[in-house]
Amino acid sequence: MPNVMEYSTMPIFALELDRDGHLSKKTMKLAREEQLTNTLLQGFYPGIRVATVDVPTEPLDACEQAIVEQALTRVEFDGIRYSLVGASGSAKKGKFYAVETKYEKRLAERFRFSPQAAMTYFGILVSSCKVMIEVPDCRLLVVEDRQLGTNDCRGWISHSLFKRLQAKHREDLVAQEMQKLLANRKHCPGEHEDCQLNREEQATLEERAGSKIDHKVLRGHRFYQFRLAFDKAQAKGSFKIMADELAEKLEADVILPKSSVKPRYQGGVLRTIRSILGDRQAHAFRGSVLVGIRDVSRDLEFQSSYTLVEHAPDDSIELEIKPNALRQIERLRKAWEENNFTELFELLGTQEAQSVLDVGEDTDPEYTSSEYTVADGALVADGTGYMLKHPFVNHHLQRVLARWAYRLCTSGGFRLPGFALADDGYLVLDRGQVFCSSDWIPNDRGIASVPSRQGLIVRYPIRMKEDLLPFENLSVDEVLSLLSADLEKHGCHMSDQQAAAVVDQQLRLKGTLTLHSEAAARNGGDFDFDQVCVVEGDKFPRFVRDRIMYQEQHSAQKNKAPKPPSPWWNLPQVAMQARGNQIGSITDLKTSCLANGRDDLARQLVDQLQNALDQLKHGTQPDQDVIRNVRNEVSKAPWLKLKQKQRIADMDEHLPVTERDKIGKLYNFLRKELGRYFSDAAVAPLSDFRGLIGGGGFTPEIFAECSTINKYYANVVTQILSRRRELWNELENANAAVEAKKDDAEARKELLFRRNQASAAYSAFEQRSKEELRALIDQVRVWAQGKNGTRLAYLSALHAIVCRDRGPDPEHEFVPGTGSIVFYAFPQEVVDQIAARTGGRPVSVEIPSLRDGEVEIDREGRIFLVSHFVNGDGQVHERLIFLAQVTRKGEVFCERDAQGSPIIAERVRPFPIEAGRSEVQGGMVTFPGTQRRPEVPKGRVALPGSPN
């Protein structure tokens, strides 16, 4: 049986310092990132003790700043001395990493004893990967960017090394699944905990585990984000796969551009001289290498944003964006009135129809769909519609709809296809010669799997209109023609068939948008797995045309000036300077400038936004005087204040906006169309759901244990909500004090500082409370995971406790709430019980080519249109006309080829098929006698908004 890496889970101690320098322990999360699962740091030093240290993010006076900096030099917990060693992207939120002091020097050496480099790049070592392996004898080659078909942060990995990663990934997944299956088996009736499997049982269990995880294994024909370490260096970026023949020719299993190595690769004087003299192997390394795959390209979907729509022309808003939004509102209204969840589930990230699968993708056969959260799963499984009234589900739904309504009213609510940004580099071997090239497609062209010929490439955050990059989408034939011409230029005369294979394997990878590096850099992109989306010219022709005709007025490039050197002992001071994330506030201030018709002020903020983006990497700082002066010139766009509303009913139906405020006018137009979707009577008491969970007998001991865990959960949530309310009141009082002294300049200065402290403290607590709630949910889930074999009993007891009438009870203290703990502790069991107790919802499959009408479905999944005709005897008869078939493997087809083989149109999640009569409406066919069984993946939760 395959084994998981021994050091696959390393817990991190979560600590925090207050402004007085007092150190305390935070609740520990169980996420992969918080356990260093599959990280480089774990690979270097198995068993190393690591702690995160959170510092205050609010403004500190000189004394408080010095106290916190001193405290960072002497972190001690449970008798272990820790030393600060760096940060990840979370430095902006005041979160830093510390390790046992004995490891400090070794880690500092990896960053050349530079505090700035450690603050910027330590995150490479603690980034959790999907899979990681150590290659004892790896051949690694470092080259200049764009040599051997590389580009900015984009390298090559050999096919055989990728297959090893793929095999290790599968091995890890199978081992984890086997552990689950064995745990379930031990708690089955009649089984003993020490039972041993015979060879046949072991093989059967391994086969079952393999079938359940096949769809999760790394797939080929993708773009891969990596983390890598060799010698005393670390690297990050993206890989394409090169053929093994090329790897042997170049004597390299991995090829890295220098830009991937962080801090930037130097290589020594002798290697540099050899490189200048043309020695391709000058920067070759052979030895132990740790390499991991962090992410894989796939088809993505981005939501529109007001930072995008504010650059749309008026005619696009009127004729393209508004009509799309109105159609969404009408579909939602109709679905709501008819109790049809199709559109509603789409808003929640689920689908009424069976989800379409990727080619070659496998799924867990026990479930008909995979939902985003347990609340979504409850709605999908419910056959009555009454679960909408459940306090927890209703609260979740209200929040989701409020977020959707805000997006709709401020950005039109449309969706954009998303991609990983990839380069055009290729590397081929033809007739024993190596041919390669980079940046050979024209600057204004791109390769993307969208039907539109023209489009705009969007990379968030959007600094200015110039960031919306117009591009022309190359067809397959055009890419092939350009590639053939470039190969010819380099003396390569491969066949069209071979060139087509290069296009397929290196240039049109799934889930990627391929660009020239100069084009990517125009809006701040590189090839370190940046993600972009596309405004399609076919759907938004006026928007795209307006940007193409626009005369650019400003250019903002990344500031890559080297950081000033600083000694290692200044690491705490550098850490405190890295705090603070102004990206969001500057972006919203820029938006307010545009809403007030002050385009000139918005342009002043473009460079400040870039400085904020470069703050951690390049040590730049936004000019606070510029920001302050702009803030004094413009008022905040009123619709920005509605961003955090939890219910549609709390969003103003009309706002006072300026004539130049495109988003404000769009909001006022769409908000009045939304109306209200929930009344005060929309929520039923928890006691209405007492009979929902049944069939699990429990003992008084189980009931008492569940009562204890419920009290603990409710107390923690209550404390968090109470503290949030206290901080909010402090902020309100600080605002009132500033307003009361608005004419006293001297007093106002101190009061403004305290107000800013209160505001930052409230914002920091909002983020921290989310982390603590997730940690609490993790604790509840760990408790529940130990109940294998008695899960239904514990679920029944816990459900009875939270749904009990709130009358006095001398033995048990019950806390009112939404019943959220039940959904978090036993998510899959709750959803399964809802499906069983309500009768569930039938499975539907969308086949757009089907015409509406009555259909008959047989046991093989064949769908026949029922046609009625009158025979010569005057009697009405039926004729069955074949329309389509959904096989038991989930294959959907409507016709066969000349050899009689089905032409597969798409694949859906397989489900048990029953024969019977049904109806087709709008291309949707419902299968009679079926029941949806949603799967709720672990870790997907909606945070509670109230105790219990």
Indicate residue ranges for each PLM-predicted region.
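Beta-strand-enriched accessory nucleic-acid recognition/scaffold domains that flank the catalytic cores
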Residues: 1-524, 530-531, 536-948
